[in-house]
Amino acid sequence: MKNLNLSKLILKIALVVTIVLSSMQEVKAQFDVGADIMSRYVWRGAGYSNGPSIQPYMSYASGDFEIGFWGAYANDGQVDELDLYASYGIGPVGLTLTNYVFPDNMTPGTVAPVEYWASEGGWEGTIGLELGPIALTYATFFDAGSNYIAAGTSLGDVDLTIGLGDDFYTTDGDMGLMEISLGYGKDIMITEDFSLPASGSLIYNPDADQMYLVFGISL
């Protein structure tokens, strides 16, 4: 079983390396770091915190390739998150490989680094397609087989997203509508020379009959 898991990890790392090599070109590389402060962590129609969530990120981009870390931390007893991702754009198509990791689920000092990034069910592949004003997304977890399909568009200044999912996304595990989201963003002027990007989202999950109103600022 360990050999099988190691083989899976090697294949996943090989995919990341392939994306990196295919993106090597004479372009300006750029590092970036920042954070979003959200009133609540809501992802794909489900809430993952009961209160404010700090979501830092660190990334490196070169041309159409980007690799980075993204985290979510809430002081409310919920599970923290630290993800590794790599993405590459080819015209209207975007490819992303993400490893979702929840450090609180692991006992300190008992997990080797290679096992940390080989958590079962944590690797997800995503394909995005821009078709004019419509953005389509398909994502699947390689080990768990969970699927997520979404379509997004802009209605003036408001972004609309409709998502469907199966497995853990829905109460019965069958494919169903689990996300209807309306989002809006604006800059809040602090001084003449400084402003804070702010966003708000109204999210409804028809499957769970849950609604969220989320506000956030970006640093």
Language-model segments: residues:
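Cleavable N-terminal export/targeting peptides
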Residues: 1-32
